[in-house]
Amino acid sequence: MTDQINKLDPDTAIDIAYDIFLEMAGENLDPADIILFNLQFEDHGGVEFVETADDWEQEIGVLIDPDEYAEVWVGLVNEQDEMDDIFAKFLISHKEEDREYHVVWKK
């Protein structure tokens, strides 16, 4: 018998990622990036729910099942509405009772 995963809806995943971003950005981003984000987020900011990539093992050193996680990006979008300056990529577990997350910060 397999356990059914109740996946996060995109809005919930976005809210979780953005809350974590606001809490941890000061410790993980370059001060210049924080200033850039604060100045441009109102006009060009984006928090996007994207298809979960299968290359997270390279980023975090752990093999994951993309179906068990949501991926959210926080960054700035350009004139073509493409996110071209990504400040953080979040991998958030769909398991509500044991929510875990991983973050890859802009270097």
Curated annotation (Swiss-Prot):
It comes from the Bacteria. Signal peptide: none annotated. May act as a double-stranded DNA (dsDNA) mimic. Probably regulates the activity of a dsDNA-binding protein. Belongs to the putative dsDNA mimic protein family. This is Putative double-stranded DNA mimic protein HSM_1473.
